[in-house]
């Protein structure tokens, strides 16, 4: 699915026009209301700067947290301040996202100026994709740009509803890059293609695993979900996390991999803990020797070697989900080793894609984010795209 992009709009097309740009400025704040990580704001800069340089009047819309109505703590004021610093120009901030105050401020905008609307989720109509609310949001603009990949899997008023009232509706640079990497990895990858899927639950990754079994040459599984596979094989897993209702599914996934000739790799050894704590006692054992009363919190060193060998000849790797409880330093070695491995194979031309969520945090923790080909900004959106699902916020944009 090829979408029309902001890059295709010329200055002649949009100079003096009002652009409604959906961004994802849902950034973390500390107790004092200071932004602790501005990655999402920086990610939107290429689109904003492109529009201002082409002479558009830029109106930004974002959600922030999960407010139930107006919440003073969830106003976008700190975001406007940070964005002003990053752009090197004043960002005008409104106290609402629709209505007379907004219309009045938009009317004063000069070409190349930027205005940030208040948190669109202050209205419950946003998440209900209410057409009247979408119409009011769209009333102050001439065309629409979606650069909020992280919410593209939601059909909300500011991601989907507004496209019915604004034309053209196009993808921003961030959304374009996400589609380029995540879709081509699934639809037309350089092979061999390997996927590394981690995380604690099989249930949350079933769709991705099933899709990837159709597309991948190798599938590596780590994280807490491995114990559901082991138990399905009849192994003792101690008090490790197991989804009892997914044992048959685990068996069928292994059978499906075999049938398709996909190399499905599970860890050969695990790091165990006597309880779920950063300072727990630990021991490393092979998967056949997990004693009662212990729980697995990371993959072991032998597994790391096996996975490294499997990844050595790959041309494309998608990684979604950690290998263990990497928040605890004692149980972070497996996840960190995978991050280092991807950085290494990336140097020899392998495309490395970090598919959102906790694996992004893991790569950032070890300082290797800039050595990956692509780091997805979406959690749920990345997963759904990798599953081959249609994302409403993308589907609503104009075809190229």
UniProtKB/Swiss-Prot annotation:
Pfam families tied to this protein: PGK
EC assignment: 2.7.2.3
InterPro entries linked: Phosphoglycerate_kinase (IPR001576), Phosphoglycerate_kinase_N (IPR015824), Phosphoglycerate_kinase_sf (IPR036043)
Binding residues annotated for ATP, in chain numbering: 205, 296, 327, 356-359
Top-rank EC class of the record's enzyme: transferase
Protein localization: Cytoplasm
Domain of life the protein comes from: Bacteria
GO cellular component: cytosol
Pathway where this protein functions: Carbohydrate degradation; glycolysis; pyruvate from D-glyceraldehyde 3-phosphate: step 2/5
Key words of the record: ATP-binding, Cytoplasm, Glycolysis, Kinase, Nucleotide-binding, Transferase
Subunit composition and interactions: Monomer.
PANTHER family for the chain: PHOSPHOGLYCERATE KINASE (PTHR11406), PHOSPHOGLYCERATE KINASE 1, CHLOROPLASTIC-RELATED (PTHR11406:SF23)
Protein name: Phosphoglycerate kinase
Native source species: Nostoc sp. (strain PCC 7120 / SAG 25.82 / UTEX 2576)
Encoding gene (name): pgk
